[in-house]
Amino acid sequence: MKRNIAIVAGGDTSEIVVSLRSAQGIYSFIDKEKYNLYIVEMEGRRWEVQLQDGSKTPVDRNDFSFMNGAEKVVFDFAYITIHGTPGEDGRLQGYFDMIRIPYSCCGVLAAAITYDKFVCNQYLKAFGVRISESLLLRQGQAVSDEDVVEKIGLPCFIKPNLGGSSFGVTKVKTREQIQPAIAKAFSEAEEVMIEAFMGGTELTCGCYKTKEKSVVFPLTEVVTHNEFFDYDAKYNGQVDEITPARISEELTRRVQTLTSAIYDILGCSGIIRVDYIITEGEKINLLEVNTTPGMTATSFIPQQVRAAGLDIKDVMTDIIENKF
């Protein structure tokens, strides 16, 4: 009998549009001969399943099921592709743990750590991972322009500490830009991270592990036409994404080894993607860890899967079957 798979998308942040795109990508990637697929949209208290006829029906949160006519359908597995809360920060994972439904990605702790950029960086720094200098501001806290310049320097990045897709991010070059950038970041999240700029080559590396194997994908080099890898660059084509990256085999191996180590340190599950900046002297610096990476047809992970000579359908099957 086919397993019923929920592709869980939506969320309560600006990234909802990106999440819904990823859901369509995942729907196209998963083997429909093996699984019954349904997209489940979550937004606030609205949890709905998309039916084949285009209509939507509510999800019963008691057991994560829905009624399809007179038939009750209970999901066997959740593929979480919510970028942002509640799917990337551990909240939804806690719900699925409580009702004992397996899911595609990291558990509560790893998701919560990686969703908080500042906490994740400080945690991994303790294991010897290189990170940039940064400051954290919480709602109600303030920092002077002088302190930013003295402690972090210019240029710097001011961004929401929670969230992704570069919403609310500003590359700050002058003192006059600091406070407006902080206000912009606070409009997206309750915490703001002020991070030192690092110039160099931007790379990203995907990885997943199962009970039987460990797979680290070829690296992608990210060359943006904009000031930085912002929303336009990510989703409107203002970037060159080169897979495999134009770097030495030795540096490739080092980045892949570090990615695998970060996966294990954090206790990850499913597919993750780790972003880096390579600075002078081939120093590998962590940017961030993504535990629910984008999965549209043109996203980094599908590109890397193709470059590795793998079939994305087989990768999706690995992720699902590893939980049974």
Swiss-Prot record:
All copies of domain ATP-grasp, residue ranges: 121-321
Residues noted as binding Mg(2+) 2 in the record, renumbered to the chain: 288, 290
Recorded metabolic or biological pathway in which this protein acts: Cell wall biogenesis; peptidoglycan biosynthesis
Cofactor: Mg(2+); Mn(2+)
Broadest EC class assigned to this enzyme: ligase
InterPro entries documented for this protein: ATP-grasp, ATP_grasp_subdomain_1, D-Ala_lig_Van_CS, D_ala_D_ala, Dala_Dala_lig_C, Dala_Dala_lig_N, PreATP-grasp_dom_sf
Positions that bind ATP: 149-204
Keyword set, alphabetical order: ATP-binding, Cell shape, Cell wall biogenesis/degradation, Cytoplasm, Ligase, Magnesium, Manganese, Metal-binding, Nucleotide-binding, Peptidoglycan synthesis
GO biological process annotation, one example: cell wall organization
One GO cellular component term: cytoplasm
Binding site for Mg(2+) 1: 275, 288
Cofactor: how and how many bound: Binds 2 magnesium or manganese ions per subunit.
EC nos: 6.3.2.4
PANTHER family named among the record's database cross-references: D-ALANINE--D-ALANINE LIGASE, D-ALANINE--D-ALANINE LIGASE B
Function: Cell wall formation.
Family per record: Belongs to the D-alanine--D-alanine ligase family.
Record protein name field: D-alanine--D-alanine ligase
Species classification: Bacteria, Pseudomonadati, Bacteroidota, Bacteroidia, Bacteroidales
